[in-house]
């Protein structure tokens, strides 16, 4: 359904760079939120095939990636690759119900303003590591970009944070005090890393609030 690839400085390696495919079942092309298989690969064999369950949210075009505890599959570039990829795809499909159940559970969990602030703070630590070097505040990260995202449940809070971090463009100040804007996360590895980390944070909140 969707494809992208990493940018490379050496144009001769453009056809061999890491790429990502987001795959959906035929009956899940449209919908408010649809489960996906995220396939990562590089044609030169420098990284193994990876298949990760995810969710695509149409209202903000957010592509979410589930954490490692939801059945990430890795297939090395050797042996019966096709057979292993097909088997791995079925394994990922098998966890879709669990992913959907957790999503629905998050929609039922209300977060007060302090809890939303804590979620935003944890997310910024994932991106910038040092709290003193974050160019924006947790309040900016949890601020909705559209009317549909003003709800205070865990699922929607997570969506706001994910979109603000991935798309960037937030006004802030650098460590030296200069005006700046947060950068969008455009690389495949960075996108996957942030998404996985946010899923883990959301899961921790779900368990804490349940």
What do these predicted ranges mean?
Residues 5-14, 20-210:
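Intrinsically disordered, low-complexity regions enriched in serine/threonine
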């Amino acid at each position: 359904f969707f494809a992208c690839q990493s940018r490379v400085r050496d144009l001769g390696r453009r056809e061999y760079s890491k790429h990502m495919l987001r795959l959906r079942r035929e009956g899940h092309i449209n919908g408010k939120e649809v489960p996906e298989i995220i396939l990562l690969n590089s044609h030169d064999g420098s990284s193994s095939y990876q298949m990760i369950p995810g969710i695509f949210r149409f209202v903000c075009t957010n592509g979410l990636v589930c954490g490692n505890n939801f059945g990430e599959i890795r297939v090395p570039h050797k042996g019966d690759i096709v057979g292993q990829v097909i088997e791995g795809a079925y394994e990922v499909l098998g966890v879709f119900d669990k992913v959907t159940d957790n999503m629905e559970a998050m929609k039922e969990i209300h977060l007060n303003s302090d809890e939303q602030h804590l979620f935003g703070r944890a997310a910024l630590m994932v991106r910038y590591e040092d709290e003193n070097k974050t160019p924006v505040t947790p309040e900016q990260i949890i601020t909705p970009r559209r009317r549909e995202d003003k709800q205070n449940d865990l699922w929607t809070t997570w969506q706001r944070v994910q979109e603000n971090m991935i798309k960037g463009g937030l006004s802030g100040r650098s460590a030296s005090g200069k005006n700046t804007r947060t950068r969008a996360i455009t690389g495949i590895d960075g996108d996957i890393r942030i998404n996985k980390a946010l899923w883990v944070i959301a899961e921790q909140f779900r368990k804490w609030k349940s």
